[in-house]
Amino acid sequence: MIQQETRLHVADNTGAKELLAIRVLGGSKRRYAGIGDVIVASVKDAIPGGSVKKGDVVKAVVVRTVKESRRADGSYIKFDENAAVILGSGREPKGTRIFGPVGRELREHKFMKIVSLAPEVI
């Protein structure tokens, strides 16, 4: 579960290393985001020469959460860290590589480009 002020690792090669969640998109009273949900975030740490800089406000999709999430078949999925992928125009990822596994929920939320770039879909 991701909410305001949550810090997330960045799972792509845009140059950002850490994000701070500003807002969960999808309704005025929406408090939490899970795998496949879009958030607005600020870049808190970035490497020099990357496509995003520290302080940039970006949209990102959550790809891993520490809090377990229940699936329709009754199983649960959880990861060791909270991570997100920065989005560019539309729902396409800004980077060209994705690092680490991503949840299968991204396929249901129509993030097919991220699913195809990811080394493993769990």
Curated annotation (Swiss-Prot):
What biological process terms from GO does the record include? translation
Q: Does the keyword Transferase apply?
A: no
Single Gene Ontology MF annotation: large ribosomal subunit rRNA binding
Query: What SMART domains does this protein's entry cite?
Result: Ribosomal_L14
User: Mind telling me which GO cellular component terms the entry cites?
Assistant: cytosolic large ribosomal subunit
Per UniProt, the keywords (alphabetical) are:
Ribonucleoprotein, Ribosomal protein, RNA-binding, rRNA-binding
Keyword match Ribonucleoprotein: yes
**Which domain of life does the protein's organism represent?**
Bacteria
Tell me which Pfam families the record gives.
Ribosomal_L14 (PF00238)
Per UniProt, subunit arrangement is: Part of the 50S ribosomal subunit. Forms a cluster with proteins L3 and L19. In the 70S ribosome, L14 and L19 interact and together make contacts with the 16S rRNA in bridges B5 and B8.
Q: Which family does it belong to?
A: Belongs to the universal ribosomal protein uL14 family.
Question: What is its biological role?
Answer: Binds to 23S rRNA. Forms part of two intersubunit bridges in the 70S ribosome.
User: What's the protein here called?
Assistant: Large ribosomal subunit protein uL14
